[in-house]
From Swiss-Prot:
GO terms for biological process: exit of virus from host cell nucleus through nuclear pore. Its main location: virion. This is Nuclear export protein. Average number present in a viral particle is estimated to be 130-200 molecules. Mediates the nuclear export of encapsidated genomic RNAs (ribonucleoproteins, RNPs). Acts as an adapter between viral RNPs complexes and the nuclear export machinery of the cell. Possesses no intrinsic RNA-binding activity, but includes a C-terminal M1-binding domain. This domain is believed to allow recognition of RNPs bound to the protein M1. It holds the Pfam family Flu_NS2. Gene3D superfamilies: 1.10.287.230, S15/NS1, RNA-binding (1.10.287.10). InterPro entries: Flu_NS2. The gene is NS.
Length: 121
């Protein structure tokens, strides 16, 4: 796992938690929760790849890991669309920078998860 990605996650989550988007704060909290969930999933896949022999363990723990992987990609696409939408409607430069960084992070994480999953297949 790239240490820069880990610190990027922490930075984005901290920045998002400080934002006040009025009535959409519930949406923002949902995005933060999704980001945290995505980080945990990416980390667990990365650990499985590091152990390489852990594919069988991963399959035993979750026989539907491919289905779960597909769901994670759907979550990433949903988050990308949400972040793009927030980026379009916000006029605050701090929020714009945060959402641009979040978007870049999502693209990086999507690529990492794809790489991990191909190594596990």
């Amino acid at each position: 796992m790239d240490p820069n990605t880990v610190s990027s996650f922490q930075d984005i989550l901290m920045r998002m938690s400080k934002m006040q988007l009025g009535s959409s704060s519930e949406d923002l909290n949902g995005m933060i929760t999704q980001f945290e969930s995505l980080k945990l999933y990416r980390d667990s896949l990365g650990e499985a790849v590091m152990r390489m022999g852990d594919l069988h363990s991963l399959q035993n723990r979750n026989g539907k890991w491919r289905e779960q992987l597909g769901q994670k990609f759907e979550e990433i696409r949903w988050l990308i669309e949400e972040v793009r939408h927030k980026l379009k409607i916000t006029e605050n430069s701090f929020e714009q920078i945060t959402f641009m960084q979040a978007l870049q992070l999502l693209f990086e994480v999507e690529q990492e998860i794809r790489t991990f999953s191909f190594q596990l297949i």
